[in-house]
Amino acid sequence: MPMQGAQRKLLGSLNSTPTATSNLGLAANHTGAPCLEVSIPDGLFLSLGLVSLVENVLVVAAIAKNRNLHSSMYCFICCLALSDLLVSGSNMLETAIILLLEAGTLATRASVVQQLHNTIDVLTCSSMLCSLCFLGAIAVDRYISIFYALRYHSIMTLPRAQRAIAAIWVASVLSSTLFITYYDHAAVLLCLVVFFLAMLVLMAVLYVHMLARACQHAQGIIRLHNRQLPAHKGFGLRGAATLTILLGIFFLCWGPFFLHLTLVVFCPQHLTCNCIFKNFKVFLTLIICNTIIDPLIYAFRSQELRRTLKEVLLCSWWPGCWAEGGGDSVWPGSCVTLRGPLPP
C-alpha cells in the first residue's frame, strides 16, 4: 500500500518506504550516500484525492443529467471521470485504513486486512488501467470525428460505444486481478509498462495526425481568403503548444510511476534505483494530480457541460428547479442540441 511502512502488493518486491521527517530531505542509502527523498504529507495526499473525487463526481453527474450529453464522446469522458474517481477514491480509502491501523483505532484480524488489501489493490489497478484505456478511446473518437466526419455517427454509434466501454471495464478488472495475483513475476510489471507505452504512442500518433490535418485545413482557408502565411504559422504554433501540454501532462503524471515499475524489474537492488523507490508515494500523487487535470482538459472545455454543471450545483441548493427543466436540462430553453461530433 502506498504509505509509510507499507506497500502495494503489486510492488511487493520493493522495500517499505521509510518514514521521512521533512517534506524534502536527504535519506541515506545502504552505503550512506545521500539520497533525495520527497515526503508527501498524508493530509496533502488525502486533500488532493478529495478534490479529484468531488471534481469527477460533478462531471459524472452533469453528463448523466443532460440527455444532450448522452453521445459516444461524452460516454467516454464520463467513464474517464468514473475511472479517475475510483483511482483517487481507492487511494484515499487505502491511506485512511492504514492511518487508522497505525493509530490503533481500527482493530481487526490479519486475514481481514489482507482481504481488504487485495480488494483495494485490484480496484486501484483496474481503475488505473481503465483511465489509460479511456484516454486512448477519447483520442480514437476524436480522430474518427475529424477524418471520418461524414460517417462519424454511423461509425461511433452509442451501442458500439457502450460495448467498447463494457469491454474495457471487463478486461481491466480481469487483467488487474491477474496482475495482483502474480505480482511477483517480472512479466506482470513489464506488461503494465508496455501497455502504458502503447497508450502513449497511440495518443501521440493520433493527436499529431489531427494537428497536421488541422494545419492543412487552416492553410486552405488562408489561401482561399488570400491571407498572409504568418497567420497559419501562428495557428500551427498554438496547436503544437496544445498538443505538447496534453501529451506532456499525460507523460509527466503517469511516466514516473511506470518508470518505477521498470526499475523494479531491471535494477531492484541497485542503490540509485533504491533512491527512486523511496519516492513511490510522489508518483502516486502525480497520478492523483492527473485525475484532477483530466476534467479540465476533456470535460470542462464543453460549454454545454459547464452549463449543466452550474445547473446541477444550483439545484443541489434548490431541489425544486429539477421540475422546471423537464428532466433534460434544468432551466427551460437551456438545452442545446449537439450538431456534430466536435470534441469539447
UniProtKB/Swiss-Prot annotation:
The keyword Phosphoprotein does not apply. Disulfide bonds: none annotated. PROSITE patterns: G_PROTEIN_RECEP_F1_1, G_PROTEIN_RECEP_F1_2. One of its GO terms (molecular function) is melanocyte-stimulating hormone receptor activity. It is found in: Cell membrane. Residues 1-37, 94-118, 184-191, 267-279 are extracellular. It comes from Cebuella pygmaea (Pygmy marmoset). It is a multi-pass membrane protein. Receptor for MSH (alpha, beta and gamma) and ACTH. The activity of this receptor is mediated by G proteins which activate adenylate cyclase. Mediates melanogenesis, the production of eumelanin (black/brown) and phaeomelanin (red/yellow), via regulation of cAMP signaling in melanocytes. The chain crosses the membrane at residues 38-63, 73-93, 119-140, 164-183, 192-211, 241-266, 280-300. This is Melanocyte-stimulating hormone receptor. InterPro entries: GPCR_Rhodpsn, GPCR_Rhodpsn_7TM, Melcrt_ACTH_rcpt, MSH_rcpt. Glycans are attached at residue 29. The keyword Membrane applies. A lipid is attached at residue 315 (S-palmitoyl cysteine). It holds the Pfam family 7tm_1. Belongs to the G-protein coupled receptor 1 family. GO terms for cellular component: plasma membrane. Interacts with MGRN1, but does not undergo MGRN1-mediated ubiquitination; this interaction competes with GNAS-binding and thus inhibits agonist-induced cAMP production. Interacts with OPN3; the interaction results in a decrease in MC1R-mediated cAMP signaling and ultimately a decrease in melanin production in melanocytes.
